[in-house]
């Protein structure tokens, strides 16, 4: 059917309608009446995530995929625990119990569902999300330090001191991405490359810029060291060594007494098993498993929503994403 073939392309219903010589309303009606995409079976490795759907059934939709094949397995209208629990509980045990790995962010509802319904699986906390806990902690520290400097500068009677504090605050804002850069993922030449700093009227290497900024505040310097220590663990640790490595980091973070890192320590301790599992090497791919592939699928979902200028009808959105996002799907007429 032409409507289904055209709907597989990443285009709006308005564009699709012009090609077929029908109205947008007619094309949507024909599409909705012609398709009902079945869920794909659960596989050995599944990723679970959410994306902003803003349909009549809820703000966030739940997406389920297979990172090994790149297929979207299903999309649900809600990420609420009771909803996804009921959904998975209605899938036969034989199918659920053959799932070996489940990858997700550190959303407590997901952990509850995995523990109770996927009893043969290993739950993996996605690397990006657990690393982000520390980057967010350091970023809060950076912003708090920057605001502290600006407040002191505003009250200072010493013009030179005020000027210097504003300079540091400006550099913290301008070079925040550099401060968050993972030195264990960058080439050495990246940090040794010189940049011209207008505020200082001179050239500095990226490493010199970092040192100039963090040396202005003891907590900021310690926070930066903690951030890089965590990055090092994420790159060089292993399943066998992780517990020892992260416990050393806990001691380092606790001794720093930086408030912005306290919540991160608590989160890591609560999720230590799932975080450790992120270092497991999958036997078939010989790589660690992540939710990275879902980022591409989430971008696809956003693009389809944008092309449709938003979808209030969840089933319309789901069927369109499933049709565009999968190479092979089962369609119920």
Question: What is each model feature region?
Answer:
Residues 130-151:
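Short alpha-helix plus adjacent loop in nuclease-associated cores
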Residues 16, 47, 103, 123-125:
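A structural signal for short, well-ordered beta-strand segments and their strand-loop junctions
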Residues 12-30:
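Short, basic interhelical loop/turn and adjoining N-cap
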Residues 1-10:
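Short, amphipathic alpha-helical "recognition" segments used to contact nucleic acids or chromatin
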Residues 31-32, 57, 77, 94-120, ...:
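Acidic/histidine-rich catalytic cores and adjacent linkers
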Residues 68, 127-128:
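Residues at the C-termini of beta-strands that transition into short coil/loop
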Residues 26-101, 106-113:
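RNase H-like nuclease fold core
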Residues 62-64, 116-122, 138-143:
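Short secondary-structure boundary/capping segments
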């Amino acid at each position: 059917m032409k409507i289904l073939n055209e709907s597989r392309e990443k285009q709006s219903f308005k564009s699709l309608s012009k090609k077929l010589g029908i109205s947008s309303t007619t094309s949507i009606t024909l599409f909705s009446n012609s398709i009902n995409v079945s869920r794909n079976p659960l596989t050995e490795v599944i990723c679970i995530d959410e994306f902003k759907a803003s349909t009549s059934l809820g703000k966030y939709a739940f997406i389920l995929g297979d990172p090994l094949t790149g297929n979207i397995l299903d999309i649900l209208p809600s990420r609420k625990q009771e909803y996804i629990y009921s959904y998975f509980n209605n899938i036969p045990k034989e199918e659920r119990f053959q799932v070996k790995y489940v990858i997700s962010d550190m959303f407590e509802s997901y952990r509850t569902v995995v523990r109770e319904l996927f009893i043969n699986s290993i739950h993996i906390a996605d690397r990006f999300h657990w690393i982000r806990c520390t980057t967010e902690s350091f970023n809060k520290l950076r912003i708090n330090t920057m605001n502290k400097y600006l407040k002191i500068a505003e009250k200072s009677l010493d013009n030179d001191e005020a000027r210097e504090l504003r300079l540091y605050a400006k550099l913290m804002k301008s070079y925040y991405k550099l401060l968050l850069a993972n030195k264990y993922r960058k080439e050495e030449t990246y940090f040794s490359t010189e940049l011209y700093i207008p505020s200082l009227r001179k050239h500095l290497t990226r490493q010199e810029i970092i040192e100039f900024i963090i040396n202005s505040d003891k907590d900021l310097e310690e926070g930066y060291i903690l951030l890089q220590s965590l990055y090092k663990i994420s790159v060089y640790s292993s399943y066998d060594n992780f517990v020892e490595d992260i416990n050393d980091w806990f001691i380092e973070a606790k001794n720093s007494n930086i408030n912005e890192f306290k919540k991160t320590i608590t989160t890591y301790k609560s999720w230590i098993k799932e975080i450790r599992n992120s270092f497991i090497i999958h036997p078939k791919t010989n790589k660690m498993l992540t939710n990275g592939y879902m980022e591409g699928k989430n971008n696809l979902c956003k693009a389809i929503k944008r092309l449709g200028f938003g979808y209030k009808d969840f089933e319309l959105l789901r069927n369109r994403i499933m049709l565009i996002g999968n190479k092979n799907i089962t369609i119920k007429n």
